[in-house]
Amino acid sequence: VKHEITKVSKEFGDAYKGDYAHFTLKEIYEQPDVILRAGETTIEGIEKAVEYIKNAKNIYITGSGTSYNSALIAKQILSKYVKIKVEPIISSELQFAPETIEENSIFIAISQSGESADVLEAVRIAKKLNCKIISIVNLLTSSLTRKGDVVLGMNCGPEIGVAATKSFTAQITILYKIIQKLSENITINFEEFSESISKMIENPKKIQKIAKELKHVSDIYILGRGINYPIAIESALKLKELTYIHAEGIPAGELKHGPLALMDTDVFVIIINPNDSTYTDTLTSAREIKARGAKIIGV
């Protein structure tokens, strides 16, 4: 019996942590390289995915945990840059509302392992409705790979750490590569992205100093607006998974609808506020929090 040979994206040696204290740290430092590699073995796949998306009447995108947060970002960037509407769906919820999906739609499924039971169940429901499946997956020998009409490989190597780090970066990179193909007016410099992350992580002392201050905190709130809101949700998930501290991502504009009542001198708030269209409004939210005595970490 002849079996087809599948080439994996990385070497088995990448499953060793080397001189790093733990795998998560190693995988954080691999992110600059991941940006350059994500999707590089699936250029034809990206082009085919773009054709599906261009001709789609309805597009859904699903995932669990970090992959769902990537789906939320996909909704924002596809709408903003190429005016394409996408509906994110939590994989575990679809079985309770399968009527959400229209027949003959495009269904994008994201999973690092390609073996998440909830994601595979969501794909099963979508295939039953004659949807075309675009699989964004790291493990190219996985069940999700086999179920995809188009497969986009993250190509980020083994992810041993419990918390998704480099695979999240790979997922977002692939989504931006799709956008670049969808629009003739957008040019994205992925090398510049890679260099920016390298600069950010090359001097960890400031981050370590902040981490020591947060060591005994029991609650952390993370705020953001626009595309920074799903980043806040993902940041909160990382804190919960790795530190066992209660962390919550909040849309900064919703601060006055409940969360502001929790702000006092014992609370730490991380505010994601780059110099974009959300900057001024988010700064106003920061002032409201500061007035109640909460400690603020600005990103």
Residue ranges and their predicted role:
Residues 2-6, 142-148, 204, 253, ...:
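Short, functional N-terminal and low-complexity linear motifs
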Residues 51-195, 225, 238, 272-299:
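Glycine-rich phosphate-binding loops that contact phosphosugars or nucleotide phosphates
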Residues 1-32:
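Intein/HINT protein-splicing elements and their conserved insertion hotspots or analogous self-processing inserts
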Residues 11, 90-91, 251:
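Short, solvent-exposed coil/turn linker segments
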Residues 23-60, 150-268, 278:
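Active-site phosphate/pyrophosphate-binding segments
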